[in-house]
Amino acid sequence: RDNVIVQIKNGPVDFQPREPYSPLFGAMPRTPQMVEFQITQEYLGFSNHLAYLAPMWEEFFDFVKPSSLKAIAGVANIGTDTNWCGHPFAQANWYAFGRMAWNPSLTSGTIAEEWLKQTFFDVSNPKHAPIAYEIHNMMMESREAVVDYMMPLGLHHLFAWGHHYGPEPWCDVPGARPDWMPSYYHKADKQGIGFDRSHTGSNATAQYPDSLCRLYDDIRTCPDEYLLWFHHAPWQHTMQSGRTLWDELCYRYDHGVQQVRSFQKKWDLTENYIDAERFKDVQSRLKIQARDAVWWKDACLLYFQEFSGMRAPYEVERPIHELEDLKQVKLPINNHECPTPKMLNERR
């Protein structure tokens, strides 16, 4: 019907840090469709974490032609902060959504450059260029860093029960729906980890066009970033890097932590170029993000290590938490509250 548009989330589950695009796009060629993105960071650290989301949306448009859509929606919320968004860099996601909705051919890099020029400093100004270049890179790397320290290699739904802030891959709530539990998705056991959506499992790969179906269905050709979305892979599975799956998982979590620490250093370069209030605000939030990244890394690797029985590679930073202590972390918040630094420091 011409007066009906079916609104579809960008991915098959629910705005995870990385999902393949929903196969509903293209499956109903006679039905008007629109995509639903999430601007607010329900699963990407709320307004405590820097996560520039335009690369995620650009990734979606690599698979789904904008011309096939009738409209775009963005799920967002605002608060009482002066900047409405909490994190100063969360404003960039509102801006990027508007720019991509108007012109989806724009690159996420171009949009980040526009936003930086209007918000902090001009990339083309020789005085600001070196600093702006570093902050532009920080923005462009931020979403991938979140993927790495939260749910790399296609993992998803590992977050805490209820409010979705922080890791809880062990979560098991008696009487709750099985598909609300992390174990329903990660399916970690002594043999391996990941959700088998190939032809030997749920066969979700068959919902994609033939070329992608073949790519995703074969564990030998499935891209690393979607491996554990589509396959229950053995811990010793050889990744594209040549590492085992377990080693690659460790390296990805560790890389995410190191990335956030590099963001702290890059941001410190801006102190003499912007106002003190915004400088300190972002600096404080990056401290939270750095500690949260370690929290995620330790929680997930210590938990999954109970199944793999394998040691972390020598180069990977060792945990600073005990698994049993992490299992006791409970934040007294709901979906619409962002934990404060004081709360996090007392509880995680």
Describe the residue ranges of each PLM region:
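Active-site clefts of carbohydrate-active enzymes
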Residues: 31-59, 76-77
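Generic structural motif
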Residues: 11, 40-42, 120
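Flexible loop/turn segments at secondary-structure boundaries
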Residues: 13-16, 42-47, 82, 145, ...
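Eukaryotic scaffolding regions of large macromolecular assemblies
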Residues: 17-19, 47-50, 54, 86, ...
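A generic structural signal for short, non-catalytic loop/turn and secondary-structure boundary residues
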Residues: 1, 27-32, 68, 90
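Beta-sheet entry/capping signal
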Residues: 3-5, 32-36, 71-73
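Gly/Pro-rich turn-and-neighbor structural signature
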Residues: 1-28
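Catalytic domains of carbohydrate-active enzymes that cleave complex glycans
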Residues: 62, 67-348
